[in-house]
Regions:
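Gly/Ala-rich beta-loop-alpha elbow adjacent to hydrolase catalytic centers
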Residues: 115-119, 123
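Active-site signature of alpha/beta-hydrolase-fold catalytic machinery across serine-
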Residues: 36, 125-129
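Proline-centered flexible-loop/turn and helix-kink motifs
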Residues: 46, 131-132
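Serine-hydrolase catalytic machinery in alpha/beta-hydrolase-like enzymes
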Residues: 2-106, 110
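Short beta-strand immediately N-terminal to the catalytic nucleophile in serine-hydrolase-like folds
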Residues: 113-115, 140
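Residue-level signal for alpha-helix termini/capping positions
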Residues: 105, 128-131
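Conserved small/polar residues in nucleotide/adenosyl-binding loops
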Residues: 144-146
Length: 146
């Protein structure tokens, strides 16, 4: 199991952290994929810290990218493999959130998850089922089973 995430970070242009946005990339990508959004967003959100982790697992279908969990229909993994990896990734993301909360003296309501595709799936799962007091979840192009 991976214990830490490789994270790209950008401090706020104001120098004062009042909010955090965590980007969660899609299947087969990496943290750099969404991190480029931090430049235009920082102009509108000068007190916002941006973070973009790589998912913890190398992607079975894309040798240069990462995955939050395997997809059985794509890589031949099993549903239990997928669920175990999903739970493990969620724990790592919650650990990351808690770390920023402590580091910057923030509340959960000051932290937003922005996820694309598979990153959206895990963002919605965390935001709706585990940490429903987050500042928000922005989901782009995904789904969730309720």
């Amino acid at each position: 199991m991976v214990n830490e995430l490789n994270v790209k970070e950008k401090m706020p242009t104001s120098g004062s952290v009042k909010k955090v946005v965590i980007f969660l990339h899609g299947y087969g990508a990496d943290g750099a994929d969404l991190f480029s959004l931090s430049d235009p967003l920082s102009e509108q959100l000068p007190d916002c810290f941006f973070a973009s982790p790589d998912a913890p697992r190398k992607c079975g279908a894309s040798p240069f990218g990462y995955e939050w969990f395997p997809i059985p229909d794509i890589d031949g993994s099993t549903i239990p493999d997928m669920m175990q990896a999903l739970a493990s990734s969620e724990k790592l993301i919650i650990k990351l959130i808690d770390g920023y909360k402590k580091r910057f003296g923030l509340d959960y309501s000051d932290i937003v998850l922005l996820g694309f595709s598979q990153g959206c799936m895990i963002s919605l799962n965390i935001g709706l089922r585990q940490l429903n007091n987050l500042g928000g979840v922005v989901g782009i192009l995904s789904l969730i089973h309720i």
